[in-house]
């Protein structure tokens, strides 16, 4: 077990060892724990409250979306865009939380971190409403190759997940997923998740990265990641 592994490491090194959960539901508590350990309770509480506000906002909005209106999202990673993370994994939990549906649930999960490779035929079979691609994927060539027959591609409903300083959904599944909730909710259901995404990104970067993000920098990050008009 993880607890046993932590005990072993602590005994071998003589250094106090803790395990921090990566689940979004536990992340605020994790920051509060770190604040207690490091003596930075005030800063940790500010971060934890942002996370709590984010998760509560998403849960409230998702509850308003009827099952019949939940968008099917293909979340493709890797250079081919065909490595798909399983529903319920920490790599894909942002999709579930904002009220969408993971379009492809691999029958056999062979690699939770990097995703399970599926065929393009499987993608066509589910006909996703929206396609999300990680950085380094086939975003630039999607309209020219085998993906071009998909309705989501033809209608411009494909996007590249922002990735600075880390991916906002996975790779690795870091605290940036908190910002990913705001981004994906606003992208998929803008009438429910109605706010200025640039302002949210600026607040997040100030709190979590101690960086004053300019409007121009935010626009650059979101250039492949916002609704096309």
Q: What are the language-model segments listed below?
A:
Residues 4, 60, 90, 115-122, ...:
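Alpha-helical scaffolding within the catalytic cores
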Residues 4-83, 162-228:
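Extracytoplasmic substrate-binding proteins
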Residues 12-13, 98-99, 153-154:
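Short, structured coil segments at secondary-structure junctions
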Residues 84-114:
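Alpha-helical, coiled-coil/dimerization segments enriched in small aliphatic residues
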Residues 19-20, 105, 133:
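Short beta-strand and adjacent tight-turn residues that come in two discontinuous sequence segments
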Residues 1-11, 134-149:
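A ligand-binding cleft/hinge motif common to bilobed small-molecule-binding domains
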Residues 1, 15, 119-136:
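Proline-aspartate-enriched helix->loop->beta-strand connector
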């Amino acid at each position: 077990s993880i607890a046993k592994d932590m005990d072993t490491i602590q005994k071998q090194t003589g250094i106090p060892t803790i395990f921090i959960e990566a689940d979004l539901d536990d992340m605020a508590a994790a920051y509060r724990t770190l604040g207690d350990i490091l003596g930075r309770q005030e800063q940790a509480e500010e971060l934890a409250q942002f996370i709590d506000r984010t998760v509560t906002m998403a849960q409230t909005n998702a509850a308003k979306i009827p099952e019949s209106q939940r968008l099917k999202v293909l979340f493709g990673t890797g250079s081919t865009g065909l490595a798909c993370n399983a529903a319920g994994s920490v790599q894909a939990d942002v999709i579930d939380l904002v009220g969408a549906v993971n379009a492809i649930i691999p029958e056999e999960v062979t690699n939770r971190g990097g995703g399970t490779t599926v065929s393009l035929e499987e993608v066509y079979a589910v006909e996703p409403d929206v396609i999300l691609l990680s950085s380094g994927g086939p975003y630039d060539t999607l309209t020219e190759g085998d993906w071009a027959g998909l309705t989501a591609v033809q209608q411009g409903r494909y996007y590249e997940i922002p990735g600075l300083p880390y991916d906002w959904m996975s790779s690795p599944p870091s605290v940036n997923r908190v910002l990913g909730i705001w981004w994906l909710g606003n992208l998929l259901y803008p009438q429910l998740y109605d706010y200025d995404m640039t302002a949210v990104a600026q607040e997040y970067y100030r709190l979590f990265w101690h960086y004053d993000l300019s409007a121009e920098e935010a626009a650059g990050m979101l250039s492949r990641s916002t609704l096309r008009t």
